[in-house]
């Protein structure tokens, strides 16, 4: 079993996906990622069929692998590093897949020139959907965990890193706004 622990939750870190649009007629907010362009780009690097993403604002979370291994990718312009199990520290870049192993910790310091950043996990976070979506609406208390993340939250990921190939794409030009969510 693979598991991660949130060692620092960051600013308003929540679980999001592309949104729940089938319940708006009942007054349920669609929620979903604030910047869907970024999670669309992350899907190209880390196919995440459950569409579960960790969204954070300004100050990102720190995530430590408790057991096993996990393949992730961070989206958005962020300062981040990896504290390896042997206490060495590696700088890393967004839009590149990263293999983390037991004891490794991803530290996202902050976003740069943007509000939101995202983390994609290769096999999702092992969560159950709520109203056919993983998105969190903190005001309504709806979502897979129906609240922002807290320090010491643990997620169990069902599979090991499936391939050792590290994948990257050119940093997307997100300045071109074609459509956006209000």
Regions flagged by a language model, labelled:
Residues 1-182:
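Conserved "landmark" site that anchors the functional core of diverse proteins
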């Amino acid at each position: 079993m693979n598991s991660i622990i949130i060692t620092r939750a960051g600013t308003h870190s929540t679980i999001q996906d592309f949104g729940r649009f089938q319940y708006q007629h009942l007054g349920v907010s669609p929620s979903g990622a604030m910047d869907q362009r970024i999670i669309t780009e992350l899907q190209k690097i880390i196919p995440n069929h459950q569409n579960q993403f960790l969204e954070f604002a300004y100050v990102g979370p720190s995530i430590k692998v408790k057991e096993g291994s996990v393949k992730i990718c961070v989206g958005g312009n962020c300062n981040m590093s990896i504290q390896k199990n042997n206490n060495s520290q590696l700088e890393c870049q967004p839009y590149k897949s990263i293999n983390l192993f037991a004891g490794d910790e991803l530290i996202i310091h902050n976003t740069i020139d943007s509000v939101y950043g995202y983390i994609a996990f290769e096999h999702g976070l092992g969560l159950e959907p709520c109203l056919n979506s993983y998105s969190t609406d903190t005001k309504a208390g709806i979502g897979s965990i129906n609240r922002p993340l807290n320090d010491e939250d643990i997620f169990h990921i069902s599979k090991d890193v499936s391939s050792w190939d590290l994948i990257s794409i050119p940093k997307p030009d997100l300045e071109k706004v074609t459509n956006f969510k209000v």
